[in-house]
UniProtKB/Swiss-Prot annotation:
Disordered, as annotated region: 55-90
Protein family according to the UniProt entry: Belongs to the bacterial histone-like protein family.
Subunit-structure text: Homodimer.
Molecular-function annotations in GO: DNA binding; structural constituent of chromatin
Protein name according to UniProt: DNA-binding protein HU-1
Biological-process GO terms, alphabetical: chromosome condensation
Protein species of origin: Halalkalibacterium halodurans (strain ATCC BAA-125 / DSM 18197 / FERM 7344 / JCM 9153 / C-125) (Bacillus halodurans)
InterPro entries: Hist_DNA-bd (IPR000119), Histone-like_DNA-bd_CS (IPR020816), IHF-like_DNA-bd_dom_sf (IPR010992)
A Pfam family matched in the record: Bac_DNA_binding
One annotated Gene Ontology cellular component of this protein: cytosol
Highest taxon, organism lineage: Bacteria
Keywords noted in UniProt: DNA condensation, DNA-binding, Phosphoprotein
Length: 90
């Protein structure tokens, strides 16, 4: 399912126009992104939680030359599914 499919599903299930469903989906994405940018965590009970995980700096190798390089620390968004979502999938 891509974003267009999600908008269509939201429009159908919530009986909204595609324009309103698109605004709602965009608002959810922007809200989650904004909270994560500020270092927060988004918990949706039963669905799961979004958070930022820090990955420390580490050494790696350039696959073309074999030269050892330093890979800088990064912050990555992560999603942990909730119990109800896990149960629904299994």
């Amino acid at each position: 399912m891509n974003k267009t499919d999600l908008i269509n599903a939201v429009a159908e299930q919530a009986e909204l126009s595609k324009k309103d469903a698109s605004k709602a989906v965009d608002a959810v994405f922007e809200s989650i992104t904004g909270a994560l940018k500020e270092g927060g965590k988004v918990q949706l009970v039963g669905f799961g939680s979004f958070e930022v995980r820090e990955r420390s700096a580490r050494k790696g190798r350039n696959p073309q030359t074999g030269e050892e390089i330093e890979i800088p620390a990064t912050k990555n968004p992560a999603f942990k599914p909730g119990k109800q979502l896990k149960d629904a999938v299994n």
